[in-house]
């Protein structure tokens, strides 16, 4: 699968990815939600800065860590242990302090020719798609949440 990852423009997430100071993305929630347990090594990540409308950077998933039912202390320890790769501000640490964590480490980052996103009203900040063309203007299709559903294969407790 291919993943489209929205990057917070206020925290300059994409700039940190581009300058190499950020090599891991975090997503969290009170319960498992995208991309928890749905992203795997060697899959492709495409990055888009919120508000830009342009998909401009690509990378490959190197490693994924999924956590559930964490205590406050465990959350803090996991974030602190990985913060050299995450490069989170204190505000971001607070934002991502939730019981279910998904840490996605990536490598082979490259700048690509910008592609215009065909934005649909139901899109989340992390999309799981078959190909990047599925969300690019001129070749897009209606976003299908089937790719985001839990399956028996990735349904961990």
PLM region descriptions:
Residues 24-37:
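A short, compositionally biased N-terminal segment around positions ~18-40 that is enriched
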Residues 3-5, 24, 45, 101-104:
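A broad, low-specificity signal marking well-ordered, structured residues that form hydrophobic/aromatic
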Residues 13, 28-31, 53, 67-157:
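Contiguous surface segments at macromolecular interaction interfaces
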């Amino acid at each position: 699968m291919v993943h489209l990852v929205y990057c917070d423009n206020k925290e300059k997430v994409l700039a940190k990815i581009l300058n190499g100071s950020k090599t891991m993305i975090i997503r969290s929630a009170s319960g498992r939600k995208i991309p928890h347990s749905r992203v795997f090594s060697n899959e492709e990540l495409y990055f888009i800065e919120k508000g830009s409308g342009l998909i401009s950077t690509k990378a490959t998933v190197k490693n994924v860590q999924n956590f559930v039912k964490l205590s406050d202390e465990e959350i803090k320890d996991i974030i602190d242990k990985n913060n050299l790769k995450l490069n989170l501000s204190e505000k971001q640490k607070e934002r991502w302090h939730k019981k279910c964590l998904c840490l996605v480490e990536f490598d082979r980052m490259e700048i690509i020719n910008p592609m215009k996103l065909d934005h649909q009203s139901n899109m989340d900040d992390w999309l799981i798609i078959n190909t990047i063309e599925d969300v690019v203007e001129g070749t897009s299709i209606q976003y299908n949440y089937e790719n985001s559903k839990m399956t028996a294969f990735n349904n961990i407790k």
